[in-house]
């Protein structure tokens, strides 16, 4: 045998596992046989996630590393990196657009160095859905709200949409669903995910990454889909593997059956609280058991959607009969449905074949104990049972007596619900939730109840199909009568695009200093996210959102207080409006049909005819505040970094979210971004949101730490931390607005550090939460812990994440912001480093910290200055 053949024989031969899939003309890779060849009897004990990861290794991994990679899965180890090759990238128009702006900028950088810009192309199927740019400027009680909101969206976003249109033809493998068609996760669930792919004659499990933390929505179908930042998405787009280590895979056994009248929203809010307490951060969860089997795909999707809210990476369900029925319901081709069932049963991905799966950790959750819930204020895992509203001090008898007169006179009370929004793919992709809301509206209309006049109501389904089945059931007019007309098919209020309030209502809130709130069927309620004048927000099921529009205040015991009286003077309670499960199921069963999905999606996914290929370089518009050539290959960002002599830009507490780091909501005229837009001659009416300007770094960097709800512990008054987008410039000790501090430090070329508490970077997967601090000159973030996506984004931008050892934090170190910081040691994956802190009096502290570059690939990315710098070097080397 030749030396070459001998060397090849030492490795697993991938092709021996390539077989014909019975009953088809397709082939597949038999991961079971590959695993059994290494460790007989192991495959049947593997969790669902491990089986899917094993398949893609057998199909894609380098033969030299295949056996070692499979052993990581078999032996449940996490000490070696292995490659993951997602089949698709799905994007919304904020992070997806900024990713494509980066690629367009990369083309420019390569052209400037004499390279071929046309070589920069996504090689993995990339699907961009425009869903984040519509604001609810016209509420659901305006019969023309949809058309008016869409017209405003087109006008405000002309620059952005021009760039996105260019991308369709300038880049290969990029498809675009334009504005006005729905939410990316719901379209992914209802149409885009095939569950099982078939390409070039090979069948394999669908997998994807998405530029939104709620990408796990389609985990409900058994598809590994995880949220990533735009930078990691760019890596996958360009055909690079996403290097990973075997995650913690946790089984969540769902037992019991839900009680009558309990919605999937109630369940997911309870599960979110439960799992947050169980500390499942960065884990892949697999829901199984009798309770899981009984849940519809709509219910499962509601649970999977909120994966980031309970801190996990994925929230998987097995493929089973519910999956097959859903694929049929949503109009998938019969051949595709048959392929899913055949492949799953052949490869051990069918639910029955996972009874023998073993988990190192199993949690148990009883669905029968779930009651009606809200979540809030401020955090989605802060569950609030509706029966405890009085006990928790939300509804107050003393308040009712004090304000009875003004409330009866239809004056806006303290605690007013100023926004009630049926919104978000979390709930509108679940027909049972939408129908339940419509049935509550119908009964309210029959009894003569109306929304309170200060409540801005809206209904923004994530799919056009919702309109069809509501019209079929005669229920859309019932929602419209209460002010819940369709305002758009987009994320809207859920991602902070709630639009302007009635000026008179806004002024009254200001003049009377009212505590006003929002109630929405979304997935996040962080302070300041929904609207600047909604001081807090509560998450609720769609039918509860309708009920709160009738109540008009959060100071209301929704279970016990009367919502009004009927014609006979009899009090009307929530129980009088709430539909039975049988009523809901009857409407869903009769009126949600495959033909509706086909009617919407066949036309939506028809290929564009006659597309003309454009020039490889984008013609940047110099006056644009939406799209600008990025700076990441220029000046200081392309040079050496300094980890010595750093000053703190901010010292922060626990649970800092990406909304704190780079908010998404409306831009106020008094903000740094607002002042810049005014200088650029943009009218205040067209400021739009922070999110929509993330393709222009000059606007977006002014959003860094711009959240007015921020508490920077360096800024105190009489010993109390002052709330606001504030900083203290050192060594002068001058308190100033955050942006002015950043500008000062940038002019001084002062390297910066941010010190934080636990769970730093929660929330949305926005890469600008990392880009903003990098452009500000931040070299290091040291925290007690990081949320997964944000930590990855920091690495991708060349910012070094460091973690305090247990028992050490900003408080034990008695930091006040006057210190200087240096980092010493060899920067390697997971290595111990020294953070040397020099106090103002010269005292030095040597603080051990852990380097949170978690893989060798991340070390390489950081060493290159970030993923964008590494891309440029790789393309030029080619």
Describe every region a protein language model picked out:
Residues 2-152, 295-301, 305, 309-333, ...:
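N-terminal amphipathic, basic-rich helices that act as targeting or association modules
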Residues 26, 87-89, 126-128, 206-208, ...:
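Structural motif
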Residues 49, 180, 196-344, 350, ...:
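Mobile "lid/hinge" segments at catalytic clefts and subdomain interfaces of large enzymes
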Residues 62-254, 266-269, 372-375, 389-484, ...:
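Long, structured ligand/cofactor-binding scaffold of large enzymes
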Residues 85, 103-159, 289-399, 559-619, ...:
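Terminal amphipathic helices with adjacent charged low-complexity linkers/tails
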Residues 284, 288-295, 523, 743-787:
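Extracellular/luminal Protease-associated
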Residues 566-580, 587, 790-861, 869:
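Acidic, glycine-rich flexible loop/linker segments
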